[in-house]
């Protein structure tokens, strides 16, 4: 039984930073203790109060296939996460490194804004390092290590699900190094875990234990006319039905509680050579910890973090959660009291971009609670003892330029830009429009994107308000 998420949600929150392409010189103002709050000044309207976060296991496994052989590399999750910080109020998440008398910052400033250091040639010597703030956009509708001690031990109050992420070669190629890929995924899962803070009795959280790069011949691809950009003859798509079945065959009995395959290829159903690309993810309903079914697949457009809302949605399906308004999983139906409409726009709505799609409905929370209660002790036990932590210190949307976001989400559309921002910002949406002969695409804002006048409000979990940056709070 498949649970299909048919629309993408871009889950970065944007911080109110002035102009795309703005050059800034971040500096550390204050540090209160080794792992306590750090104050990072970027510019007058962007001051981050950063704390450490935990997502990665202590002995993190990175796997790839070399000449047909699988090679496992043990990475120090503690070292990867050593530079990861977050600001919960600002919905920002960044990597922070001291370098030659200055500070180097990479990551998310909010829903749409990103920050990255300029090329080293732009620097004259020691001291402040020049950085660029840029914006990203979304697609249309239709890190250190932390030991698992008392904090990461499943009990009556918290259920930790161990997660493996398998990335295809196309997704891996978007990053300069294996560590950069791991840090990107760790930060994404930190923001997924924040969404799962809605859950209770138990609270559900995910531990990222392994990242693997799939073999080149692993994917199920097909060619079809480009349904989004008629000016192009053909495009490569990935068949989600064939892909999830292959993922289940290879990873359905992995040691981890759940495996998620991530691709940067457009997922699309194949109807006699015609692509229908409204599918953004797929999962085996109730598959978590099951035999042969503990898998899901999602689509992502790095470095926009567009997978966050999708993977949060698909992981809920593996935890036995149906779409709002649909019949619940039969095995837990007798444990449920709530019934919810499919039109409330929550995270598990049949379609995305609803007004509440950064949050679970009461029905989803109840279904998750009922499903977890059916799991055996082996599943509820944390087996690997270590996990990966996110180093980022602020929400990705804070430094993500809206037009850049549009360009990454719709790379084949000429002169695509973010338009009608005064209207769409308070809705925590981005309208991406190219030349007039093409349609516009409505995309969800990324966590941290600014959404009000004066940059006091940011989008977080698809709501515009004066949010406290969740990355500021230790996990």
Please report, for each region that a protein language model flagged, where it lies by residue:
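Short, hydrophobic/proline-enriched secondary-structure or compact coil segments at domain edges
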Residues: 103-111, 255-264, 429
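Disulfide-rich extracellular modules in secreted proteins and receptors
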Residues: 21, 26-27, 80, 92-98, ...
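Conserved phosphoacceptor histidine of two-component systems
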Residues: 313
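Autoinhibitory propeptides
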Residues: 70-145
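Fold-level signature of zinc-dependent metallopeptidase catalytic domains
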Residues: 2-12, 16-56, 129-289, 302-309, ...
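Long, contiguous regulatory modules within eukaryotic nuclear regulatory proteins
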Residues: 31-96, 415-416
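Catalytic-domain carbohydrate-binding cleft regions of carbohydrate-active enzymes
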Residues: 316
